[in-house]
């Protein structure tokens, strides 16, 4: 569950309660740990990210678009809170930094998990059971002081998004205006379904649209994430065609409007042994709108302080 992918689909991070080094509970169930898969390799092997895992449940949340940091949730003191780990020298740091403290930010005495970054990096979206409905809802918090790690109080994503039923996951696409989320409400076929909503000029999320079959079924379909080019996505489902519990499925975008599963319904088996190889299918050639994230600072040569600047980007491979 909790699939996270890098911008160009070279890494997959997820959580699983597969057999691990910790002891199972009285029902022979193992705690959730966080794993990483290098999608560039032919053999898809799930590797435990040991610095993030504990004897309690650890849930992956959101991999930043450039792969430089990861939000995840840890179970401590009877509730889940949000943590962040940074990637340094291709290794993850111990997630010591919480996204806010107490009621100043996302982390409260309630559960906060299954997070999502937004591209400007001024908000954190997450699932919480601390909303007004008493169910799991989608909330967000805005940063007030990034250096001091102070975040504003949690706010609901809006009445168009949250329902009287549970919302299960949220993902903000790199375009910054598209939200994919799961819900048992709206016009769900049954259990969790995956929906899409777009934000308007006033910053309000619009009426959600059900992605439809075969993505959604009468079973639970959840934890949807998509690549930057909008052509490939991963999600989890407990449909009968899987191996029991939640399995991770990969799908291809085929056509202008609808997201379609590949006919073979390639799934990533949540096991410690090599994950099943993904089949590369031929996709019809059509023009794609590619997204490039450009980040950096312009500094004064003497003072080394940030200065205002105008940057021009020229594509030598085209006439634009």
For the regions a protein language model found, what residue spans apply to each?
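Short, conserved micro-motifs composed of acidic
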Residues: 1-297, 302-307
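Short amphipathic beta-strand segments in non-cytosolic proteins
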Residues: 310-320
């Amino acid at each position: 569950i909790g699939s996270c992918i890098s911008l160009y689909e070279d890494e997959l991070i997820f959580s699983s309660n597969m057999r691990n080094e910790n002891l199972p509970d009285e029902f022979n169930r193992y705690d959730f740990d966080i794993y990483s898969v290098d999608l560039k390799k032919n053999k898809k092997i799930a590797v435990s990210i040991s610095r993030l895992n504990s004897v309690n449940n650890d849930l992956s949340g959101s991999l930043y678009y450039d792969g430089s940091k990861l939000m995840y949730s840890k179970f401590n003191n009877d509730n889940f809170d949000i943590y962040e780990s940074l990637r340094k020298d291709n290794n993850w740091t111990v997630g010591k930094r919480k996204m806010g403290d107490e009621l100043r930010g996302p982390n409260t005495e309630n559960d906060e998990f299954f997070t999502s970054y937004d591209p400007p990096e001024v908000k954190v979206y997450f699932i919480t059971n601390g909303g007004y409905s008493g169910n799991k809802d989608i909330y967000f918090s805005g940063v007030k002081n990034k250096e001091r790690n102070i975040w504003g109080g949690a706010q609901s994503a809006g009445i168009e998004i949250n329902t009287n039923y549970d919302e299960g996951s949220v993902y903000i696409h790199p375009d910054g205006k598209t939200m994919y989320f799961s819900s048992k409400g709206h016009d769900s076929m049954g259990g969790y379904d995956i929906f899409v909503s777009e934000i308007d000029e006033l910053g309000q999320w619009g009426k959600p649209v059900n992605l439809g079959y075969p993505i959604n079924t009468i079973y639970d379909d959840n934890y949807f994430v998509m690549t930057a080019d909008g052509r490939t996505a991963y999600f989890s489902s407990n449909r009968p065609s899987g191996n029991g519990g939640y399995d991770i499925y990969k799908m291809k975008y085929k056509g202008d409007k609808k997201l379609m599963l590949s006919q073979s319904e390639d799934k990533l088996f949540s096991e410690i042994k090599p994950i099943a190889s993904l089949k590369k299918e031929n996709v019809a050639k059509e023009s794609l709108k590619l997204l490039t994230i450009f980040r950096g600072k312009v500094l004064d040569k003497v003072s080394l302080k940030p200065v205002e600047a105008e940057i021009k980007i020229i594509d030598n491979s085209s006439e634009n």
